[in-house]
Design a protein with these regions (language model features):
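C-terminal helical cap(s) of enzyme catalytic domains, especially alpha/beta-barrels
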Residues: 169, 185-212
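The catalytic core of metal-dependent phosphodiesterases that act on cyclic dinucleotides
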Residues: 35, 41, 51-130, 146, ...
Length: 215
């Protein structure tokens, strides 16, 4: 509803500010944390986005590298050059940028060399079935290799069990998210979870230990 109405831009700015504020609080309490926010396609067309973002980071004294913005491939379709210019300005601040749900949109691979990206997030559509589908396993493996060869990190979505986690570890996947790693939590639950180091699985392969998606 918000996406098709007029609420999505102010709502996303509000969520983004709250995320930066929460990030400041967690880091002040000693947690090594990165927060990721989904970026609305409409907000990606807002020329004021870099200014607002810089204001939030400055006001709450947060290192820009501690914030990551997730962009869907579809969000880049309407005006790719305009979106690219805005993302370049955000990248210049030091904010991390990632493509969310990689492999399910309509964009070209050419975007990977034109955008200032830090990471790809491979969609759960492929990850959740990789133990049962040879095609999905090949797609996941190829995407991991593609990201690494381009100097990007890779995040796997939809890690629902230990088998998938082990397979991703074997492929060299950098980070993971899903119910096997951690279910949605409140702010206080996240603090307890991080303090207990539940994110460190046996074998030394870490999921998104410092990576908390917020919106």
């Amino acid at each position: 509803f918000a996406e098709v109405g007029e609420l999505i831009v102010p709502l996303t700015y509000r969520v983004m500010e709250k995320a930066v504020q929460q990030l400041h609080q967690w880091q002040a309490e000693g947690f090594r944390t990165t927060v990721a926010c989904n970026l609305s396609p409409r907000l990606l067309m807002d020329d004021d986005l870099p200014r607002h973002l810089e204001g939030f980071l400055t006001h709450y004294q947060v290192d820009p590298a501690s914030l990551e913005l997730e962009i869907t491939e579809t969000a880049l379709i309407a005006e790719p050059e305009r979106a690219r210019e805005i993302l370049l300005r955000i990248h210049a601040m030091g904010v991390r940028l990632s493509i969310d749900d990689f492999g399910t949109g309509y964009s070209s691979l050419a975007l990977l060399k034109r955008l200032p990206l830090h990471a790809l997030k491979i969609d759960l559509l492929f990850v959740s079935q990789m133990l049962h589908s040879e095609q999905d396993a090949v797609i996941v493996s190829s995407t991991v290799n593609l990201a690494h060869n381009l100097g990007l990190s890779i995040v796997a979505e939809g890690v629902e069990n230990a088998g998938i986690q082990a397979a991703l570890r074997e492929l060299g996947c950098d980070e993971a998210q899903g119910y096997h790693i951690g279910r949605p939590m409140t702010v206080e639950e996240i603090k307890i979870w991080l303090a207990a180091d539940h994110w460190l699985p046996a074998g030394g392969w870490a999921g998104p230990s410092h990576y908390v998606a917020t919106a």
